[in-house]
Amino acid sequence: YGREQEKIHNKNFRFTLTTNGVLLNDEIMEFANKEMGNVVLSIDGRKEVHDHMRPFRKGAGSYDLIVPKFQKFADSRNQDKYYVRGTFTHNNLDFSNDVLHLADLGFKQISVEPVVAQPTEDYAIREEDLPQLYEEYDKLAAEMVKRHKNGNDFNFFHFMIDLEGGPCVAKRLSGCGSGTEYLAVTPWGDLYPCHQFVGNEDFLLGNVDEGIKRQDICDEFKCCNVYAKEKCRNCFAKFYCSGGCAANSYNFHGDIHNAYDIGCALQKKRIECAIMIKAAEADEE
């Protein structure tokens, strides 16, 4: 259907597939390599970390099942246009070991990011965790510089930064474009600003049959930018994070024009590390 609509409307649709790997097989890999501009392979890192958060109904983990499939999948895409994507929690604050574990498995495109959860959850990241997490990012950045020198480097999504080009001004101001340039569509055809708002009727924009019915919600998201957020105005990182995630802001503060504080702190640390890596690489040249 998508390819048909491309021709009719002179558009180029790019599709992404996210998989936990359990049902992944050669047929699906072949289809994804033909049709998907990017694939996201969901794995949290070391076996004990992954299996703890992702058990089957009977308690067994999926690590041993999915790793060989993911390695094959990544190689079939020439180690490009994919990410192995993990989430670290309060249970594995030493997450740099998970990133390096994935790199040692042969993956070249890696993204491991902090869980976003309410403080009542036992796995939630807490403010007192921040000093250790800062150390982990420093440790990871130093190891990446070392591996770059040795020729066995890899990309870590949250350290990728473009100091000379990067997104346009509009993107730097407002980020992902949720509710304006970007929508989530449910299997029932309902429209929401993004997938994290799905199910919250206060953010139900409309449906695919009738279109946008709540233009007022879209207008509110249009005003969601770094200059409208008090916490962002004087922050050195505002044009790199673009104000952070509107859903996280709403879930923690009840307002899309606020900012998720732990996320802000970690984002600033990641930008510092990314700049350090750029400086280290420049010194080599």
Task: Pin down the residues of each PLM region.
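Radical SAM/AdoMet-radical enzyme domain recognition
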Residues: 1-115
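Short acidic/His/Gly/Ser-rich catalytic and metal-binding motifs that mark active-site loops
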Residues: 47-51, 119-122, 244
